[in-house]
């Protein structure tokens, strides 16, 4: 009995040691075993021995091969097309395919045995098995070859454990088999090859200076394309003599630029590219090859490392301008105001021409917050792609059109692995509404993050591993082999232009100096910096290679270096007296717009729309095609809206919004609304996209208003705030004539994108002179829903307000909402708008407007009067101004709480004044209004806790206004919730008690 128990264990040990047998091969093992049971001589002797050892317990091994019972058999589905695509473990299929081919060749006399006679059946079987083993070995190189590639220029990286996965012996080949030609059916570009011939191609392709990861890609066409592009006897990295000299020239420029600045500005921060100079010829190759394949524009985003080099050597920014900035000079013309930013954050744009193809390059300005520029670049690229097609386009732009604009992102290794926004952007890459036909990611992998070693900055072997989740091909390459780097850049560009998918280049290099030039890296990385000090520069190494090839002499190289240094000296002299004279931020799509230089000017814009036009739009908003099956609740919604249009009364929030969108679209302004659940609206209020209840077809009334209108896009975004808001901000930078809106699901969640608000939206214009008309809709209001569904943290945005940088509003009527949205497009400048939007007011009986309030001479009102003044037949009648005892100023939904409480109590000597726009603060308008009530007590009422909401922001402004009008009461009294750590209570009883308390305080 004991013997029988041991037999399957032994067999399982044999099975476990056979590395190419795993769960995916269960079918193959079963098929072989079935053959063996019928006729033991029909299988290879090794398999015969293996199966013989199983005794009667084959089921045990079969189970072992199949894996656990809960896995789904035959999943994932194998891609069994051509042989190249069938190499994913379905070996039975491969063997059958090869056997059939060999039989065909034998029949034609093309395949002969060792004696020169036609192949026997046994020889065909043996040859087929040789083929399968060879293909298994080839597949192993494709899967794991990158782990054995020569990637680290310093040679410090630990070699991975070698499990002999790539050894021919592992696949049953002994040295005695090395001279035998094996049929591999044009895999590796050869029909027949010996084992050494295969190894030569495989090692050169997968274990040289480039390591390619692509076997995680599920699309057989993409995988086959990469194999076809890099495998084969004629697929070596090869450049013409002119190409090699061009690479050398660019390397000399890159290295010489850094060395020149190091001499002239010793110790000044420049975040040099020293050690990663191969980036510069690689970027040139991307632009050049892209241009040949139809690329028109590149939008770049990058961190500080090497930025000045990219600006000057790739973007063509004048060196004298950079030297002027190093001297401390401004990058803006004298007549332009702005707070400025450090030189390694600034953007630029230029046109480059290669082989007659002109490509426009723009480098996006960015903060030091790593990787946050990524979504901004993607959004900018998307807008530029849309502009290529036009504002009246259909909603689906072909990816082949989008591919004409390339987002190109440069990353640091530690940041790419560490920052969550990277994964968010990868998540956006394939989504409708956010696709950009593939971003090219270039990681400058200097194997350190400030002072942090890779072992402490990521849990995966490579910084690029996060990109595997979207099946992006990854090209790891040794930065000290410039030809390999340029080749990788070329293939990566071709892949992106062919498949319109993201692609990653991971260039292993090093950082010759510290994190910045005033830093001492040996404190924390002594061994690495010992190796770096002894290591030749990339220019030295490549120069020696070209000298050995007889292409150049040392004198040629010295002359090239001297000429470049002389050019830089000339630019340095010119930089002493350089004056910037071109303000490029109002070029191109921004032509015709201006900066808003006078905070006191009238900024209403012509936002009213004739009633006739509004009714025409309203009619189209409620029409659906005859054969379209609308949900019955939606039909009721449409019927109610139709009544509003007929009567011109009772216009609610969502209808006013749709009329604003529709009127702008008819006037030629595209609308782009993005965020979680925006098609329907978080509170089921919007319904701008209708779904057929029978077949789920979509119908968008706002895109069916009239011929030639601009497009309306509502994009239900992924569940991210940071990347999506960054993306929409980027979009608004490229198309100032599109109304771009981002809506938070609840305003509480907007702080997931706080970096974008802080570094871009609130400060981008002052730092980089880049305007944005982005609208942020943040649902806000205290209704007893708890601390996570009550507050958009209005105070945060108000704290960011200064220097006329953005607008913050908390409006209370659909009409004012209509006008403030249209105002974004109806002025000749752009400012971001942060809107606290309502929840309960969406269906509040008092929060309604009339069509008359959207038309005629109407416009946005920063202050709104007390409704009781002109709703004469409703509720209480207010006393005359002189008899008003108290003025309660407020903003947002709390107005309606105050109004209803006052009505309930019959109070007629308290006036409610709404501040609809909190910033820019309407000081002059308030002076005019409050002058009527000089003797009244002044109260500021808010529903937010005292340390939140508008109180801290508005108090000094109101004090200034009261002093100005010589009011009896010089201080404003606070009425609202007491200061709190958490924004709101989650208990309805407590919420109502707090509400009653502060209403009593405000009105009593």
UniProtKB/Swiss-Prot annotation:
It holds the Pfam family E1_dh. One of its GO terms (biological process) is glycolytic process. This is 2-oxoglutarate dehydrogenase E1 component. Belongs to the alpha-ketoglutarate dehydrogenase family. It catalyses: N(6)-[(R)-lipoyl]-L-lysyl-[protein] + 2-oxoglutarate + H(+) = N(6)-[(R)-S(8)-succinyldihydrolipoyl]-L-lysyl-[protein] + CO2. Disulfide bonds: none annotated. Keywords: Glycolysis, Oxidoreductase, Thiamine pyrophosphate. One of its GO terms (cellular component) is oxoglutarate dehydrogenase complex. It comes from the Bacteria. Its cofactor is thiamine diphosphate. NCBIfam families: 2oxo_dh_E1, PRK09404.1, PRK12270.1. Its EC number is 1.2.4.2. SUPFAM superfamilies: Thiamin diphosphate-binding fold (THDP-binding). GO terms for molecular function: oxoglutarate dehydrogenase (succinyl-transferring) activity; thiamine pyrophosphate binding. It comes from Brucella abortus (strain 2308). Homodimer. Part of the 2-oxoglutarate dehydrogenase (OGDH) complex composed of E1 (2-oxoglutarate dehydrogenase), E2 (dihydrolipoamide succinyltransferase) and E3 (dihydrolipoamide dehydrogenase); the complex contains multiple copies of the three enzymatic components (E1, E2 and E3). InterPro entries: 2-oxogl_dehyd_N, 2oxoglutarate_DH_E1, 2oxoglutarate_DH_E1_bac, DH_E1, KGD_C_sf, ODO-1/KGD_C, THDP-binding, Transketolase-like_Pyr-bd. E1 component of the 2-oxoglutarate dehydrogenase (OGDH) complex which catalyzes the decarboxylation of 2-oxoglutarate, the first step in the conversion of 2-oxoglutarate to succinyl-CoA and CO(2).
């Amino acid at each position: 009995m004991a013997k029988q128990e041991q037999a399957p264990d032994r067999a399982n040990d044999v099975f476990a040691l056979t590395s190419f047998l795993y769960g995916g091969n269960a079918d193959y093992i079963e098929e072989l075993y079935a053959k063996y049971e019928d006729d033991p001589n029909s299988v290879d002797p090794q398999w015969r021995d293996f199966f013989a050892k199983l005794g009667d317990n084959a089921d045990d091994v079969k189970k072992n091969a199949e894996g656990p019972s809960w896995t789904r058999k035959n999943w994932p589905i194998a891609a069994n097309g051509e042989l190249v695509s069938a190499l994913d473990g379905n070996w039975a299929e491969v063997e059958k395919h090869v056997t059939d081919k060999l039989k065909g060749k034998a029949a034609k006399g093309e395949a002969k045995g060792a004696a020169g006679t036609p192949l026997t059946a046994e020889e065909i079987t043996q040859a087929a098995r040789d083929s399968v083993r060879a293909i298994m070995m080839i597949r192993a190189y494709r899967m794991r070859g990158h782990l054995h590639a020569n990637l680290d220029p310093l040679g410090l990286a630990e070699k991975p454990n070698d499990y002999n996965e790539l050894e021919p012996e592992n696949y049953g080949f002994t040295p005695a088999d090395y001279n035998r030609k094996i049929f591999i059916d044009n895999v590796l570009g050869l029909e027949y090859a010996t084992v050494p011939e295969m190894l030569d191609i495989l090692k050169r392709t997968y274990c040289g200076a480039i390591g390619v990861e692509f076997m995680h890609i599920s699309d057989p066409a993409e995988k086959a394309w990469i194999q076809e592009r890099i495998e084969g006897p004629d697929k070596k990295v090869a450049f013409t003599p002119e190409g090699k000299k061009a690479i050398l020239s660019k390397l000399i420029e890159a290295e010489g630029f850094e060395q020149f600045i190091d001499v002239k500005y010793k110790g000044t921060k420049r975040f040099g590219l020293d050690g990663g100079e191969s980036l510069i010829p690689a970027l040139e190759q991307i632009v050049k090859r892209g241009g040949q394949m139809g690329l028109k524009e590149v939008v770049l985003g990058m961190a500080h490392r090497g930025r000045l080099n990219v600006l000057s050597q790739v973007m063509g920014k004048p060196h004298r301008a950079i030297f002027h900035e190093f001297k401390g000079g401004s990058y803006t013309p004298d007549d332009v105001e702005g707070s400025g930013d450090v030189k390694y954050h600034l953007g630029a744009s230029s046109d480059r021409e290669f082989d007659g193809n002109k490509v426009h390059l723009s480098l996006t300005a960015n903060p030091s917050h790593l990787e946050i520029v990524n979504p901004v670049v993607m959004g900018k690229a998307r807008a530029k792609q849309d502009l290529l097609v036009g504002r009246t386009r259909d909603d689906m732009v072909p990816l082949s059109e989008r591919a004409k604009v390339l987002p190109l992102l440069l990353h640091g290794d530690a940041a790419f692995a560490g920052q969550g926004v990277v994964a968010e952007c990868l998540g956006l890459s394939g989504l409708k509404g956010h696709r950009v036909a593939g971003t090219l990611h270039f990681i400058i992998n200097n194997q350190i993050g400030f002072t942090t070693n890779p072992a402490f900055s990521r849990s995966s072997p490579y910084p690029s591993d996060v990109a595997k989740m979207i099946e992006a091909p990854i090209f790891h390459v040794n930065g000290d082999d410039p030809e390999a780097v340029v080749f990788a850049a070329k293939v990566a560009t071709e892949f992106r232009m062919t498949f319109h998918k993201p692609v990653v280049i991971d260039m292993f290099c090093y950082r010759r100096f510290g994190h910045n030039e005033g830093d001492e890296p040996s404190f924390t990385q002594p061994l690495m910096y010992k190796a770096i000090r002894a290591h030749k520069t990339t220019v030295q190494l490549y120069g020696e290679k070209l000298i050995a090839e007889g292409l150049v002499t040392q004198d040629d190289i010295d002359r090239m270096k001297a000429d470049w240094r002389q050019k830089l000296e000339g630019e340095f002299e010119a930089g002493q007296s350089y004056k910037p004279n071109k303000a490029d931020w109002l070029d191109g799509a921004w032509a015709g717009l201006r900066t808003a230089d006078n905070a006191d000017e009238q900024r209403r814009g012509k936002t009213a729309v004739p009633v006739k036009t509004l009714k025409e739009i309203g009619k189209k908003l409620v029409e659906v095609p005859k054969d379209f099956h609308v949900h019955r609740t939606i039909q009721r919604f449409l019927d109610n809206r139709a009544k509003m249009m007929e009567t011109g009364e009772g216009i609610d929030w969502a209808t006013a919004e749709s009329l604003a969108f529709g009127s702008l679209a008819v006037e030629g302004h595209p609308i782009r609304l993005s965020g979680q659940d925006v098609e329907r609206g978080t509170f089921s209020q919007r319904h701008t996209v209708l779904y057929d209840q029978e077949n789920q077809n979509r119908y968008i009334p706002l895109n069916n208003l009239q011929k030639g209108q601009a497009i309306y896009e509502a994009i239900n975004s992924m569940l991210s705030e940071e990347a999506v808001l960054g993306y929409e901000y980027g979009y608004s930078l490229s198309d100032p004539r599109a109304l771009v809106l981002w809506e938070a699901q609840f305003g509480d969640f907007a702080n997931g994108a706080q970096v974008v608000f802080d570094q871009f939206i609130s400060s981008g214009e002052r730092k980089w002179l880049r305007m944005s008309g982005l609208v942020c809709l943040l649902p806000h209001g205290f209704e007893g829903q708890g601390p996570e569904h009550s507050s958009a943290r209005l105070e945060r945005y108000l704290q960011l307000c200064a220097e006329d940088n953005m607008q913050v509003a908390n409006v209370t009527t659909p009409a004012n909402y209509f006008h403030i949205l249209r105002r974004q497009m109806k002025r000749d400048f752009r400012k971001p708008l942060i809107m606290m939007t309502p929840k309960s007011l969406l269906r509040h009986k008092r929060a309604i407007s009339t069509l008359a309030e959207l038309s005629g001479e109407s416009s946005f009102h920063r202050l709104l009067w007390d409704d009781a003044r002109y709703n004469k037949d409703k509720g209480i009648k207010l006393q005359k101004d002189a008899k008003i005892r108290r003025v309660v100023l407020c903003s947002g939904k709390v107005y309606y709480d105050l109004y209803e409480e006052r009505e309930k109590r019959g109070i007629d000597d308290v006036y409610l004044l709404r501040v609809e726009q909190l910033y820019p603060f309407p000081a002059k308008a308030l002076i005019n209004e409050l002058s009527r009530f000089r003797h009244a007590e002044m109260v500021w009422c808010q529903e937010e806790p005292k340390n939140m909401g508008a109180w801290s922001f508005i108090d000094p402004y109101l004090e200034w206004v009261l002093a100005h009008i010589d009011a009896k009461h010089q201080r404003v009294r606070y009425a609202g919730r007491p200061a709190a750590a958490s924004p709101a209570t989650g208990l309805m009883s407590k919420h109502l008690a707090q509400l009653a308390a502060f209403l009593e305080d405000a009105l009593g």
